[in-house]
Every structure is written in C-alpha cells, then in structure tokens.
C-alpha cells in the first residue's frame, strides 16, 4: 500500500490465466444431389485444401455421411458455415455445412 498525499493507494495484482477458445468442427454433410466436384471446390476455396486433401475429405463425406473440413474457434467456424451454405444456395445445391463442438 502506498500513500499519495492524503489518499491511500492500494495495488492488487490479480493473475488471470487466459483460457484457449472453445474449438468447433466445421462439417460438410452428404446429400444425394450435390456434385462431388462442387464439394471439392468448396473445400479448396473455403478451407484451403489442396486437390488431394479435398478429394479425400469429399470421399469421406460420400462414404460416411459427413466429413470434417477443419477445426476453428467459434467465430471463424460460424463464419465459414454461413459462407459455405450461402455459396451452395447461390449455386442451387442442397449441400449443408454445420458446426460441432470439438
């Protein structure tokens, strides 16, 4: 405690530990109508996957019903979901992108 004039100044140190942000998986879900080439394009454009990575994820989506495009903090994941869903609708595809807690 320090005294400045007639005022006592109390200095308290509070140590806080920053917690890492909650992470979310961005998932593409399979449907019977969206062309495989369009899914690959989405993976390359929105998730920066190379052709081989995009093809592998697309095949996982096709065979297992869904595939993980990436894991991001909530704000980024939410933005990517919105962008992908808007892009799919603009191109008349029912492709669905969603979030899952990692």
UniProtKB/Swiss-Prot annotation:
- Note the Gene3D superfamilies from the entry: 3.30.1390.10
Which GO biological-process labels does this protein carry?
Answer: protein catabolic process; proteolysis
Regarding protein family, the annotation reads: Belongs to the ClpS family.
User: How does this chain assemble?
Assistant: Binds to the N-terminal domain of the chaperone ClpA.
Give the matching NCBIfam families.
PRK00033.1-3 (NF000670), PRK00033.1-5 (NF000672)
Described by its record, this protein's role is as follows:
Involved in the modulation of the specificity of the ClpAP-mediated ATP-dependent protein degradation.
Name this polypeptide is given: ATP-dependent Clp protease adapter protein ClpS
Instruction: State the organism named in the record.
Output: Shewanella baltica (strain OS155 / ATCC BAA-1091)
- Gene designation: clpS
